[in-house]
Amino acid sequence: VVRMTGAEKMYWLRSVPHVIDPWAIKECDAYLSTHIHTDHCDFYTIKPLLENTNCKFVGPIRTKEIFERFKVPKDRIVSVKPGDVFRIKDVEIHAVESFDRTVLITEQADLRKIAMEEFAKLMDQKALNYVLRTPYGNVYDAGDSHYSNMFFKHGKEHEIDIALVTFGDNPDGMTDKMNPYDAYRAAKCLGAKVLIPMHYENWGIVEGDPTDVEMIANKKFAPFTVCIMRPGTKYVWPKDKDKRRIYYSQQVEVSRHFRPELVDLPFPAYL
């Protein structure tokens, strides 16, 4: 981003709380990294999973260097490229092309001195999207992709139930995320049944409003549902397929433990 804007420094203020403690995770089959950026190939997540689980660490070729730097054993690293297919238990994972043009210029070398043939190979080495085919439904993870006509290709090649699509509001002079209309269009091209917007709340500099995506989808009579989730909530497919919001389950579940006969108030109608 510094490279694309010419800024001397960037202020990546995190604007969403950490709602999961990685050290509390004791069971994990695979850690899938979409690309080399530190918020998607994260030391503070990798280390706990390395120590407390037997999971595989999966990612594009250039993430292998990062995994090894974090002391992940070679036999737990799975390097993949577009077109590769592998299984983790009953989930078939397809590595497909990424369209993350920001990661494409995350490079120490002088980009002007890289031959176009070599430059064209960088994306596949540094970033991937994933299609997870499960017995119950299929999930598409767009990583940090920008909008691309290739979403249409992926929609023709795979049946997508849920599309996880990054978007945000870009500052003037900077394009790091898809905008709300891009996110709508990506999900439509993928033929998704549900669009779950993501990454819009991670960084203050590109913080977006997911109801903008919902508004566009409603205006365009989108053939999919936009589901907006609160941080730390859980989406269950297909039970939640028609839900437009996922709230904290405690709001419902906690009432089951209330006992009206034990209420202790000054008089019954106090509250």
Model-derived regions: residue spans:
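Active-site neighborhood of phospho(di)ester-bond hydrolases with catalytic His/Asp-centered motifs
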Residues: E27-D39, V58-P60, V139-S145, A163-G168, ...
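Binuclear metal-ion centers of metallo-dependent hydrolases, dominated by the metallo-beta-lactamase
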Residues: K56, K71-R87, P180-L271
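Active-site-proximal loop/helix segments of hydrolase catalytic cores
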Residues: Y44, I114-L190
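Structured loop/turn residues at beta-strand edges in well-structured enzyme cores
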Residues: K26, V72-D75, K89-V91, Q125, ...
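Local beta-strand N-terminus motif with an aromatic residue
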Residues: C28, N54, E159-I160, A192
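Pre-active-site segment of Zn-dependent metallo-hydrolases
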Residues: V1-I36, Y44-P48, T102-I114, A120, ...
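Active-site environment of divalent metal-dependent phosphoester hydrolases
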Residues: H37-C41, K64-F67, D84-R87, R101-L104, ...
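Beta-strand-turn-beta hairpins that frame and shape the catalytic cleft
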Residues: V85-H94, R133-V139
